[in-house]
């Protein structure tokens, strides 16, 4: 239900931190379009728990009733007179923090990049909140009343032309879904029928634009293009659900084929996190690489179909297939699909233990009454033919399947299959984690800014590195990203992850000279690597495959760091900055351990 209060102009009591970076030249799936030029600004504010006690004591002391009512009262007090709706993805996380999400509205329509998130602690009091609500002048009449917008088909053609999308729409028709949403039927070239939604968008110049949000799933890019509703040749911003990256070898338990031998593992699943096992969805038992959490198959042609693609099948459930690095990739495809399926399910189970559950928006077909939206396992495409020397992960909102494409790497002879590099799968899956947790499960576009997108890459590197740690490692251990797939000891990051400023000199101000998400992500990942070792030095390191908890808190520093970083994702605002994400991790520790690791976390960030 949409509120109908009048929107107020002026400034909110919280400052909006607008972060801008020069734009790199990242092409749109080889079609010569610089998607980074269309990124939204990271314009959220965040009120952490310390600041709130000082600056908003009335909000900090709010409690009573249920957490949804408390969160709604926070929004009403902080943005009086503004209209908004509650998004239907609120939940209580495994750490006891309640997360509630709101979207600003205007004349009954969403302002699509104006969000408010409120975090309620275990004690029922407000822990923190963040927002990016629009505060400028409001249009006096609803555009629907004035019909002051173009035909959606014109906007669709405008998006296709501006972004050079290979979609044929000569015979396309518009099917109305509701007052503000349409579907474009009869097109070809996209992986599903494109959709359109009439909505507002807050621009960087402080004004409001009426737009058609055109959604097109192109495989390597899943785009939300905000086309001006009057001047349909103008595209204001683009959100891409797909995260692209190059990756490193990580241990699960073996990092790559050079560091160990394959072994046969019996029943590797954890029934607490995968109660139907990995090869059932609770309704159907499978004899192939398909189950509740994922479906894995070959995708040699890089196409959209996956259900009918080849996957290994064995009625005795013996997924044992030959592989050697000197074999040609297609000759070991069954081993590749099996490895990819195994690694992705291992990630699912670990992340579930750390808090990425059904109600938090994880990827499962059957949520067996635990909350969230089901029917969204991860589609795992091995040896995907749509590219080489890369991998990507598409994260739509909760209830729609995620999609991981894993490519062949041609930098060695014979070529190398990144399904056998655990870090590739961990990094890619972590894009799904961070996009579902940040801003809530229903909002998968919160990490599309330059700084927030960089953190998305850094989180992927951090989790893969933490999982990769070896028993004898200490804080002097350095980890290079991408040695095996790149066939290079230097990998494909600027510097190794290291606690030495001589080995890795990256600091916060390094971001000023970088304008690409992987470079910025390496800075963020380096900060988190410092947090990791400060907590390990204090609490020790569990070298087992799963965390051990005491009263909901991991007993060791490695898994505690992973837990706090994950909780921070759920606490931080949509489109966070480095500072806001840091504060969210500190607030996560305040909630989980009453701040017992505050000094260790602060020292880690202060160093960088």
UniProtKB/Swiss-Prot annotation:
Pfam families for the chain: FTP, Peptidase_M36
Listed under GO cellular component are: extracellular region
Listed SUPFAM superfamilies:
Metalloproteases ('zincins'), catalytic domain
Q: Which residues form the propeptide?
A: 21-244
Q: Which cofactors, by name?
A: Zn(2+)
Q: Which residues form the signal peptide?
A: 1-20
Cofactor annotation comment: Binds 1 zinc ion per subunit.
Purpose of the protein: Secreted metalloproteinase probably acting as a virulence factor.
Record protein name field: Extracellular metalloproteinase 5
Organism expressing this protein natively: Trichophyton tonsurans (Scalp ringworm fungus)
């Amino acid at each position: 239900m949409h509120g109908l209060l009048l929107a107020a102009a002026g400034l909110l009591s919280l400052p909006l931190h607008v972060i801008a970076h020069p734009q790199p030249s990242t092409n749109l799936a080889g079609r010569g379009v610089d998607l980074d030029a269309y990124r939204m600004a990271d314009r959220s504010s965040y009120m952490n728990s310390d600041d709130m006690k000082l600056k908003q004591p009335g909000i900090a002391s709010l409690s009573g009733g249920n957490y949804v009512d408390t969160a709604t009262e926070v929004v009403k007090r902080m943005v009086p007179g503004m209209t908004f709706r509650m998004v239907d993805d609120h939940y209580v996380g495994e750490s006891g923090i309640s997360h509630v999400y709101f979207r600003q509205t205007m004349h009954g329509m969403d302002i699509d990049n104006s969000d408010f998130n409120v975090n309620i602690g275990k004690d029922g009091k407000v822990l923190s909140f963040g927002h990016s609500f629009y505060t400028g002048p409001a249009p006096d009449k609803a555009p629907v009343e004035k019909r002051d917008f173009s035909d959606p088909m014109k906007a669709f053609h405008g998006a296709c032309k501006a972004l050079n999308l290979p979609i044929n729409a000569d015979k396309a028709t518009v099917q109305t879904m509701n007052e503000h949403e349409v579907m474009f039927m009869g097109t070809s070239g996209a992986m599903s029928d494109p959709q359109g939604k009439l909505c507002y968008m807050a621009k960087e110049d402080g004004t409001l634009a009426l737009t058609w949000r055109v959604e097109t799933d192109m495989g390597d890019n899943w785009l939300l293009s905000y086309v001006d509703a009057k001047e349909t040749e103008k595209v204001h911003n683009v959100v891409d659900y797909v995260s692209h990256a190059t990756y490193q070898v990580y241990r699960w338990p073996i990092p790559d084929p050079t560091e160990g031998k394959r072994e046969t593992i019996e029943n590797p699943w954890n029934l607490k996190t995968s109660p139907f096992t990995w090869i059932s969805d609770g309704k159907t038992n499978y004899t192939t690489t398909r189950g509740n959490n994922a479906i894995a198959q070959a995708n040699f042609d890089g196409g959209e179909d996956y259900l009918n693609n080849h996957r290994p099948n064995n009625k005795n459930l013996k997924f044992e297939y030959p592989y050697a690095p000197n074999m040609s990739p297609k000759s070991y495809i069954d081993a590749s699909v099996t490895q990819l399926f195994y690694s992705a399910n291992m990630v699912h189970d670990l992340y579930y233990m750390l808090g990425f559950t059904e109600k938090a928006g994880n990827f499962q077909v059957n949520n067996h009454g635990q909350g969230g939206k089901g029917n969204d396992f991860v589609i795992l495409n091995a040896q995907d033919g749509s590219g080489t020397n890369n991998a990507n992960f598409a994260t739509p909102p909760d209830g729609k399947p995620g999609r991981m494409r894993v490519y062949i790497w041609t930098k060695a002879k014979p070529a190398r299959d990144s399904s056998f590099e655990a870090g590739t799968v961990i990094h890619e899956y972590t894009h799904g984690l961070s996009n579902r947790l940040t801003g809530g499960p229903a909002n998968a576009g919160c990490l599309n800014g330059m700084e927030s997108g960089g953190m998305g890459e850094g989180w992927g590197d951090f989790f893969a590195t933490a999982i990769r740690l070896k028993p004898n490692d200490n804080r002097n251990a350095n980890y290079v990203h991408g040695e095996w797939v790149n066939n290079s000891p230097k990998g494909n990051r600027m510097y190794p992850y290291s606690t030495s400023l001589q080995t890795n000199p990256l600091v916060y101000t390094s971001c000023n000279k970088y304008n690409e998400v992987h470079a910025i992500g390496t800075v963020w990942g380096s900060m988190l690597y410092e947090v990791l070792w400060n907590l390990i030095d204090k609490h020790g390191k569990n070298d087992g495959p799963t965390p051990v908890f005491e009263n909901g808190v991991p007993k060791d520093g490695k898994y505690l760091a992973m837990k706090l970083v994950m909780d921070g994702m759920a606490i931080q605002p949509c489109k966070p900055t480095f500072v806001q994400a840091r504060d969210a991790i500190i607030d996560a520790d305040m909630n989980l351990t009453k701040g017992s690791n505050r000094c260790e976390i602060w020292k880690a960030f202060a160093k960088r």
